[in-house]
Swiss-Prot record:
It comes from the Bacteria. GO terms for molecular function: deaminase activity. InterPro entries: RidA_CS, RutC, RutC-like_sf, YjgF/YER057c/UK114. One of its GO terms (biological process) is nitrogen utilization. This is 3-aminoacrylate deaminase RutC. NCBIfam families: RutC (TIGR03610). PROSITE patterns: UPF0076. Belongs to the RutC family. Keywords: Hydrolase. It holds the Pfam family Ribonuc_L-PSP. It comes from Cronobacter sakazakii (strain ATCC BAA-894) (Enterobacter sakazakii).
């Protein structure tokens, strides 16, 4: 099965050469997702909860556009700028993954825009269209 590019309506145009997501062999790969509006401006500066919610809602749109749900997520890579935001980010994260949690890692690092507090990249196994 060839790779399918996933670009949900209203998604910001990436500031680098990549797409929001790809689907191949029933697996959705969601690019690192930052708290950007459609013009690539950081939303909710200084608010880790609101930024995390925005990022996860964007990820959900990519996965749903590909035909999946957040329950299909199997792995998240989380990048945060400050450990002091870890609890706040986890609080919102838990709302999006109330049942069985996906595997993940979280590291502290700098992000592409200093106002961004969190970035998440995701893998979701949605199966093949029409079954399997």
């Amino acid at each position: 099965m060839p790779k399918q590019v996933i670009i949900p309506p209203g998604t910001s145009t990436p500031i680098a050469p990549f797409v929001p997501g790809t689907l191949a062999d029933g697996v959705v790969y969601v690019s690192g997702t930052l708290p950007f509006d459609s013009a690539n401006n950081v939303v909710y500066p200084g608010d880790p909860k609101a930024q995390t919610r925005h990022v996860l809602e964007t990820i959900r749109r990519v996965i749903e556009t590909a035909g999946g749900t957040m329950e299909d997520v199997t792995f998240n890579s989380i990048f945060i700028t400050d450990w002091k935001n870890y609890a706040a980010i986890n609080e919102i994260y838990a709302e999006f993954f109330p049942g069985d949690k996906p595997a993940r890692f979280c590291i502290q690092c700098g992000l592409v825009k200093p106002e961004a507090l969190v970035e998440i990249a995701t893998v979701a196994h949605i199966g093949q269209p029409g079954g399997a």
